[in-house]
Amino acid sequence: MIEIFNPAELERAKVSGRFIATVLQSLQERAKVGTNLLEINQWAGEMITDAGAHSCYVDYAPSFGRGPFGHFICTSVNDAVLHGMPHDYALKNGDLLTLDLAASLHGIVADAAVSFIVGASSNPSDSKMIETTQRALEAGIAAANPGARIGDISHAIGSVLAAAGYPINTEFGGHGVGSTMHQDPHIPNTGRPGRGYRLRTGMLLAIEPWVMADTADLVTDPDGWTLRSATGTRTAHSEHTIAITDDGPVILTI
């Protein structure tokens, strides 16, 4: 399903996007050395509930997961890159933490992710990975103009990731959003320009480049959700929800 939103609905989407951005910023500021991942999940749940929003994750039960996710936010640490299930773990100095949050406010979903170092980092490769995913996200967003194709976004993202020397996994990537969290079209993190679905004004897209330091292969934790790099190396992930408008892409989750 691909939904097309009118101008009034896009204004509601902006409110949803700003909410997600505010929650993620608050959680990033509160995530310190010693903070437990379960505390972060609790804080996210409190902010979602207080705003009258609806979590997209608590009841989320796709075919690739093991039952409902059951938490409000994904917390991926170090070699975990996607769908990190909050658990009893206290953050350590130098941990690379990714927070990925999706919620519906006023009936429209926004989805965003941010990676950052907890405390002080002694590993320049972490900073490079994070910065590379941010640049890839910027490139993908810049390519998301009305009339462009999904392949144009994918190619822009993949060009940045490949130039930095990172292998690219295409199993998981960006996606449409709207009244639900995961909609068509799928947006791989590499692709051929001029291919795929043509972008239309009124579409909402979640664009999310992610990388693992030296592999494109994933392994799944016993929890049935958390995806890690197959080699145990570190990972990074950046994501924004955008609207396609007549004037070009507009980032909603800021």
Please state what every model-predicted region is.
Residues 1-254:
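Active-site neighborhoods and metal-handling regions in enzymes and metal-associated proteins
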